[in-house]
Amino acid sequence: MKTSKVICITGGIGSGKSTLCQLIETRGYSVYYSDQRAKLLMNSQHNLVQSITVLFGESAYESGTLNSSFIADCIFKQKDLRVELESLVHPLVKEDFLRWCNESGDEIVFKESALVLETKDKNCHFIVSVIADENTRIKRVKKRSPEISESRIKEIISTQYADQLREKHSHLIIENNGKVDELEVKVDYLLSKVI
């Protein structure tokens, strides 16, 4: 099995980490999107579906599809449920990521994950944190998910690592308060540091 160099991209909700990763993909690099893969596993991995149903009840799935808004409400009201859910999902995502790396065959891969620092991800060779001011983050989340209230967005932000902690535990910080063309320049700088 070939070992890939793993560049982890992290940041809080609305920071622009997914946009950064999409720009990285346009330059020919492979990106593993942890949240997307976790949702895929939570919808397709039979034992995981059963465990989530036991943990959250029948409302966890609607017509065989994960009821994400119900799960989100539950884990914000009961922090212990979040910890239990993470203990079910994270090991499977880690396994899936390692399999994906092996299948990609790439020397360098990128991994997008909001929880790189919180979970002390051991697969990361280089950590990049994307940060943005709170108002910018709120506007971005409202634009893509208008059903989420501003107070809920602020609540989510308050549960995530502060930018000062990200700065302390990252190899590179990318400030993303501007437009995509400004981010393009920062992607090129990032690639020059890791390639």
Predicted regions, residues:
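Hydrophobic anchor at the beta1->P-loop junction of P-loop NTPases
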Residues: 7-9
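P-loop (Walker A) phosphate-binding loop of NTP-binding proteins
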Residues: 12, 24
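ATP-binding Walker
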Residues: 15
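Walker A/P-loop
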Residues: 18
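Residue-level signal for inorganic ion chemistry
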Residues: 35, 85, 110, 174, ...
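ATP-dependent small-molecule kinase phosphotransfer cores
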Residues: 36-106
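ATP-dependent NMP and nucleoside kinases share a basic, alpha-helical "lid"
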Residues: 96-102, 108-144
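Small-molecule kinase domains that catalyze NTP-dependent phosphoryl transfer to phosphate-bearing small molecules
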Residues: 105, 122-123, 144-193
